[in-house]
Amino acid sequence: MIELKAVQLRKQYTHRRLFSELSFEHRSGVLGIAGANGSGKSTLLRCIAFLQSIDAGEIHWTQEGNAVDREDFRQAIGFVAPNIQFYDELTVQENMDFVKKMSGFDPHKISHNQAHPVDWLAKTQIKDLAEYPYQRLSTGQQQRVKLAIALSRNPSVLFLDEPGANLDALGKDLIKELLTDLRKKGTLLFLASNDPKELDLCDRILDLDH
């Protein structure tokens, strides 16, 4: 199992400190990251995923007691966020194939082995949109594409930043179903949100407002 230990993290912008002396660990299940808008939820997710630098502190990812190589870690994660965009002119399937190719995806690295690969377009209920240009999709459909592409990498660690954004009631039910399945599978999950219903899906919550 892959595990996180964050020690004394600090991040600030010119005139505003988001968090400081922040320490926590996460080994299994779903860790919710809560807080008001602007509290640093999204920034913290990016920092622990090595997508943004921290100003101070240490971030340790280990697997079976051994430090995880950053390149291996990059291949082991999936990341879903509102600001992630894909190529408008490419189809959903072309975007999925392109992302996997450009990321150097190797299913034999840290990611879980799958005897029977999952059709994530079908799992996220957008199989019929596979040949549609991304730009023709609604915002809710685009959010499902983001989920499908992140999950197609079969990640050991999944970061979800406001995953229910732009989703209708059925889409939010899908999030709940996916999180339940991924938790059972052993995927390490991080969910940043200020939606109480989304946070109810978490095993424990790190509140940046306190």
What positions do the PLM features span?
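A short, flexible loop at the N-terminus of ABC-type nucleotide-binding domains that lies
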Residues: 1-22, 27, 55
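Helix-to-loop junction immediately C-terminal to a conserved catalytic motif
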Residues: 49
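Conserved ABC transporter NBD signature motif
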Residues: 57-73
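Q-loop/switch helix immediately C-terminal to the Walker
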Residues: 83, 89-105
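Conserved ABC ATPase "signature" region
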Residues: 97, 101, 111-129
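Conserved ABC ATPase signature
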Residues: 133-138
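Catalytic Walker B motif of ABC-type/P-loop ATPase nucleotide-binding domains
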Residues: 158-162
